[in-house]
Amino acid sequence: MKKITLIGSELAKTGNEFIYLGPLEECEPCRFKRICHNNLEVGTRYKIVSVRSANHPCTVHENGVKVVEVMPAEFTIIIESKKALEGVTLTHSDIHCDRVCCENYLACHPEGISGKYRVSSILPEKVECKKGNSLKKISIVPVQQ
């Protein structure tokens, strides 16, 4: 489902993704606060699907903000093989691992996942785990609640 929000003009490009972190103190007195923040969920990754041309003033973004349509982004993560079933709905939990230099670490500990998500596809790529875990790379989409 598409949502309307505002984002810094420099960042407002179709296809860009961002993780919504919540309002800043500077946002409190702004007349656009509701449009910027009420439609988004903290910790969720969004993809910009369209950008409108009008520019609006903003105390946070130097070059103002633009109205954009966003939707929760589909993205790739790594999970335990036993949980990797196409179409299933899961709540994400990071894989227990302290090897931050591992090439898979960021995919095993992704940012921007909050709440439940649906496994949209299981990718054929082989995932090598130095700790011996059986892992799969999957594409996910957030489940709207």
UniProtKB/Swiss-Prot annotation:
Pfam families: UPF0179. InterPro entries: UPF0179. Belongs to the UPF0179 family. This is UPF0179 protein MmarC5_1728. It comes from Methanococcus maripaludis (strain C5 / ATCC BAA-1333).
